[in-house]
């Protein structure tokens, strides 16, 4: 049985603009897509973050939804997959832990943002070929959280 492990860490900033700025503001628009394993989407009109996952059977499921994703702030996001459980961290808090997850196995292309999407920024995105420790997640967050943008 094929298994793989990975982690992705990055920072996302969403500017505050009115929903009529462009059509992307009225729909879920991709901010950071790790080959749909998962995809971070934001809807400005609803002020809602949704994290979607495409599974091995090519179905999509919602891993996490919140209307507490801070606009006009840098938000640290981490996807940590150990081969059996997918954990999602936002600003050093575990917000979702989904056991038995088998992401869709495909060549993965990571994309940041969407053409004519939501205004903001993405920085300090790192891919790890193994799951990372809780201590490393905390360090990735605390080491640059006071910087604007949060880069070394």
Model-derived features: where do they sit?
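Extracellular glycan-associated modules
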Residues: 1-152
